[in-house]
């Protein structure tokens, strides 16, 4: 797997990770839909300590609206508003990079869909993809 690189819409915030992705996950929960401004959120999970901000300083929003009620930190560009990545204690030392910020998303092959109980009825999940009604155990 090559280095994962990406950044925000305006280019002020750039990141990279040299780690192999832990998973590629599509989240259908209401919180992620609102955060992404879309019908779901496509994320690439990497070890948190592998994610390096190369330029810029992302702003942080502390979100407590998830099912656990624990803090979930959402990082975004303060200039253009692009959501870059997120992490929280409930998920251990994992950072979830927003796939839309990748320089090259063509290698993505998401096969895990979570919070399918909150999936919008007009969103189709590919046949054979693993589905979980909430967070997998």
Residue positions per predicted region:
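A short Gly-Trp-Pro
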Residues: 1-137
């Amino acid at each position: 797997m090559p280095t994962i690189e990406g950044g925000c819409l305006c280019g002020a915030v750039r990141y990279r990770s040299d780690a192999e992705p832990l998973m590629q996950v599509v989240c259908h929960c209401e919180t992620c839909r609102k955060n992404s401004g879309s019908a779901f959120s496509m994320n690439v999970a990497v070890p948190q300590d592998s994610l390096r901000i190369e330029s810029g300083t992302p702003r942080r929003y502390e979100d407590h609206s998830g099912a656990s009620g624990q803090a979930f930190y959402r990082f975004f560009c303060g200039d253009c508003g692009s959501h870059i990545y997120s992490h929280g204690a409930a998920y251990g030392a994992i950072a979830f990079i927003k796939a839309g910020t990748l320089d090259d998303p063509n290698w993505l092959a998401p096969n895990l869909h979570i919070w399918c109980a909150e999936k919008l009825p007009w969103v189709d999940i590919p046949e054979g993809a693993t589905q979980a009604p909430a967070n997998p155990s």
